[in-house]
A protein has these predicted regions:
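Long, well-ordered core segments of solenoidal/helical folds
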Residues: 1, 24-50, 97-115, 158-176
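Acidic/Ser/Thr-rich, low-complexity mid-to-C-terminal regulatory regions of eukaryotic proteins
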Residues: 49-70
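CBM-like carbohydrate-recognition segments
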Residues: 117, 124, 129-215
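Well-ordered alpha-helical scaffold segments within catalytic/enzyme domains
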Residues: 10-23, 74-92, 136-151, 202-215
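Short, small-residue-biased leader/transition segments that mark boundaries at the very start
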Residues: 2-7
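Active-site cleft segment of glycoside hydrolase catalytic domains centered on the general acid/base Glu
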Residues: 17-25, 59-66
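Oxyanion-binding "anion nests"
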Residues: 76-122
Length: 215
């Protein structure tokens, strides 16, 4: 039902509402709901988020837990957007920064040799095609983290560059970004002719952060 649904890319709306209105009720609501979601869906062994409770007991073909690439990309993109607006003195900022760094560190280790991330973070062999919506969100988050001094540049820049070059290679001559998994809830196979606006949006967000870095 609706009251039990929480979306990882929605919390930045509340930080923006706070900026627009100055009313701290939006920040307080976001903090409460985010921590409830974190407690429910974050796997502290794998340092990754489940898409929702239905995946707690499911396993991939290789026996590993099901962690959706784009789902965790949404979380990282959302965290970057929260941190852009959350007041520096907010008592909960440390929680978001530490979670951001922890998640970036984890996904960095799951990058494929070709620079992409896959639809399934722990079973890429079952979904061998690149998946650009998770890749573009992760690239955006890494670039933001480096720019803001949250991530060590020497460690994360090579991963970022590799990811950026990979996603650029998925852009066709007509400008279409391929390998974007369609709307869904879990890992699925992807082809180059698949595209969606959220993949393109995250691509552009990452590009903006990389432009800042290059100036």
């Amino acid at each position: 039902s609706f009251p039990t649904r929480r979306s990882s890319d929605l919390p930045p709306v509340y930080t923006k509402l706070y900026v627009l209105t100055g009313d701290k009720k939006y920040i307080k609501f976001m903090n409460r709901e985010y921590k409830a979601t974190y407690d429910h869906l974050f796997d502290k062994e794998e340092n990754l988020f489940y898409r929702d409770w239905r995946y707690f007991d499911q396993r991939e073909a290789n026996g590993r837990k099901v962690f959706w690439g784009r789902g965790n990309g949404w979380v990282l993109g959302g965290l970057a957007e929260i941190l852009k607006e959350l007041p520096a003195k907010d008592k909960n900022r440390k929680f978001y920064e530490e979670l951001f760094v922890k998640l970036c560190t984890r996904v960095a280790k799951l990058q494929n040799a070709d620079g992409f991330w896959h639809a399934s973070l722990l079973d890429p062999a079952s979904y061998p095609s690149p998946e650009t919506s998770c890749t573009t969100f992760i690239v955006y988050a890494l670039a933001y983290g480096i720019n803001e001094g949250l991530l060590d540049k020497d460690t994360f820049l090579p991963i970022l560059v590799k990811g950026w070059n990979a996603q650029v290679s998925a852009v066709d001559a007509d400008g279409k970004l391929g390998y974007v998994q369609p709307i869904g809830a879990d890992p699925k196979k992807v082809t180059r002719n698949m595209t969606e606006v959220y993949g393109v949006g995250a691509f552009l967000m990452g590009g903006c952060e990389i432009y800042k870095m290059a100036r």
